[in-house]
Amino acid sequence: MDWFYAIIYGIVEGITEFLPISSTGHLIVAGNLMGVPWSKEIRDTFEVVIQGGAILAVLAYYWRDFAGQARVIGHDRPTQRLWLGVIVGVIPAVVLGVLFGDVIKAHLFRPSVVAWALIVGGVLMWVIENRKAPPVVHDLKQIGLGRAFLIGAAQCLALLWPGFSRSASSILGGMVMGLDRPTATRFSFYLGIPTLGGAALLDFIKSRHLLAEIGLLNVFLGAAVSFVVAYLAIGWLLRFVSQHNFKGFAVYRVIFGLLILLLVASGRLANGGL
């Protein structure tokens, strides 16, 4: 059955990683409903490692853009500034992860914590969508280093409060900083490459002996499914944000967070984490 769990985890990860609805919360519920027999350490590591598939989906989706940028980055200042902004934007997450990553993973991944992050994030998303300030940044190369750093700092909210969603925190941070929805969403994808890619690689190196218990082929199966589903989700989200706001996601987050709290209160979901 490990292959079945790997596929389901891959589907859930692929759908939810880049949508602003928290992959963590959905993986917790999915694992509970399936009754996955893996240890907490194995599940935690598996969930992080299959993010690698989602990251590869970003690289595949934007490969033409990246190839074009690679050809001109040596002399094109806007392209240089864009990627310097990505580097600057990821610094807060790197510092926070190095200093407090183990503590956060050990103590803050309880379902009730994730549920409240979903709810609060949904309310905040609604509030930000109701702001009257028009966006002033409509292209990735207009973001600048200051905005990039602050968006990266906003991204850290997902590290400090699991369930808030890295995508949601970075997209909302971008919108507060004046980016329009499509640009904020694209920059969130760019920030996700080093943030999630680094975390997935580090966890794989540190914990591959745990993953061997369920089979490395199952790990790669989960990552492959995550890749395919995430690729489709990226395309859908970009089309969606070009015509719609995030209020539907805000409502969904609140409802899903309340559902998790109900499952915890009824005893259907243990509140000690996965």
Swiss-Prot record:
This is Undecaprenyl-diphosphatase. One of its GO terms (molecular function) is undecaprenyl-diphosphatase activity. GO terms for cellular component: plasma membrane. The chain crosses the membrane at residues 1-21, 48-68, 84-104, 108-128, 143-163, 187-207, 214-234, 254-274. The gene is uppP. InterPro entries: UppP (IPR003824). Catalyzes the dephosphorylation of undecaprenyl diphosphate (UPP). Confers resistance to bacitracin. NCBIfam families: PRK00281.1-2, PRK00281.1-4, undec_PP_bacA. It catalyses: di-trans,octa-cis-undecaprenyl diphosphate + H2O = di-trans,octa-cis-undecaprenyl phosphate + phosphate + H(+). It comes from the Bacteria. Keywords: Antibiotic resistance, Cell membrane, Cell shape, Cell wall biogenesis/degradation, Hydrolase, Membrane, Peptidoglycan synthesis, Transmembrane, Transmembrane helix. Belongs to the UppP family. Its EC number is 3.6.1.27. It is found in: Cell membrane. One of its GO terms (biological process) is cell wall organization. Its main location: membrane. It is a multi-pass membrane protein. It comes from Deinococcus geothermalis (strain DSM 11300 / CIP 105573 / AG-3a). It holds the Pfam family BacA. Bacitracin is thought to be involved in the inhibition of peptidoglycan synthesis by sequestering undecaprenyl diphosphate, thereby reducing the pool of lipid carrier available.
